[in-house]
Swiss-Prot record:
The gene is EGR1. The record marks 3, 7, 13, 31, 35, 59, 63, 69 as: Interaction with DNA. Residues 85-109 have a biased composition (Low complexity). This is Early growth response protein 1. Its main location: nucleus. It comes from Taeniopygia guttata.
Amino acid sequence: CDRRFSRSDELTRHIRIHTGQKPFQCRICMRNFSRSDHLTTHIRTHTGEKPFACDICGRKFARSDERKRHTKIHLRQKDKKVEKAAPASTASPIPAYSSSVTTSYPSSITTTYPSPVRTAYSSPAPSSYPSPVHTTFPSPSIATTYPSGTATFQTQVATSFSSPGVANNFSSQVTSALSDINSAFSPRTIEIC
């Protein structure tokens, strides 16, 4: 590749790139490395050794470049503190967007909003229907008979549901005579109900 080196060990290390030679082997996992310092760093993953400590917070690292990258975090934090502490030298008509002051306004007002979901349906018959906020809808058993011109509408409703705003457990049997609403509905409408 026509590269030149002043030291023979640098040339030897470089030639390994071209030949793919990896003479340094980890005795724990048998992984091979072209450089001895890479093997030394790798062995730290097995031993858990972390010889490079941060001078500011004391956190330890296995590699010096990891410590160097970590130290930059502290420098950025320090720069931010200096920016926040330094007063503005020129007055600007536009306020700064970043501020070290946090303002909160406590309120004793509790705001509630009506639910957009209706909890009951109006019914032409004096009976009760399940709420639309049910998580399950049981199938009602409906039996309609017409002995001598009178109608009987029987429904068994056993519903249990939980909702953040509503907590009801109820079981009821609704039996109502439809003879009082026969004038309002045709026999076909009563069959559908």
